Amino acid sequence: MTLRRVARALIVLPLAGISAFAVIGAAQAPAGPAAAGDPLIAGFKSTYAASVSDAVEIVTGKNGTMRSDMKLMAGTNMVGRAVTSLAKPAPAAQATATLAVKHSVEIIDEAKPGEVGVIVMEGTLDIAAMGNLMATAAVERGMAGMVLDGAIRDMWDIRRMGLTVYARAKSPRTAVGHYATVAKNIPVECGGVTVRPGDILVADEDGVVVVPQERASEVLKEAQSIDSRESGMYPFIRQFKSLQEAIKKFNRI
């Protein structure tokens, strides 16, 4: 249970004795456009990255959370299915303006509304995986956001657009002349976690979690169970003024 949620839940609103516990669900920021007719995406939008992180480990026995340097650079919460692109170092002749970002541009131009673009720049945090032109296209395609194992540039413009972007670094340096994409919609290692096309990414201020698509229903059910237990802990803590007793009773922290 995160301190953010405890603090939010312990605040009592001066309105007819109604506590913040009653409005926790309403206070959560939306996670971006939903893929039409995808109940799993809708379900994950009602939970938190922290709960989903715990749930992935419980269900799969493996970590699904990207490294802590995968930071929210722009936008807000994000949930969506992944589309992927991989870039590697390349000679200048093979890293032209077209080839440097070929597959990354393709996953954006082919994206369905609500999808999340995942771009991996193998071996560097000093070269930008995308800038404002690619971000503009992502917004126009209705993408939920982007996750970059690499750097981002043109932050001044991307923040203005409102596109959600997570990245490991910022750098103004171009990929042209240095890197070229080699494949799209393949499994990639992003932030220390394998991401496959169709996996569900759940991200908020805490970080980015990858939900394996074949276990998504189980993970969602577990995450909802975690949130339900935590919801019961808030009034217990207020009543008994003891976090230790709440942990013992609900077996949750």
Give the role of each language-model region.
Residues 207-209:
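Channel- or pocket-lining gating/hinge segments that regulate access to a cavity or pore
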Residues 15-33:
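Bacterial Sec-dependent signal peptides at the C-terminal "C-region" and cleavage site
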Residues 1-14:
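Bacterial N-terminal signal peptides that target proteins for export
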Residues 29-197, 211-253:
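Feature captures the catalytic cores and cofactor-binding loops of soluble hydro-lyases/lyases
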Residues 2-5, 20, 43, 249:
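Intrinsic disorder/low-structure terminal segments
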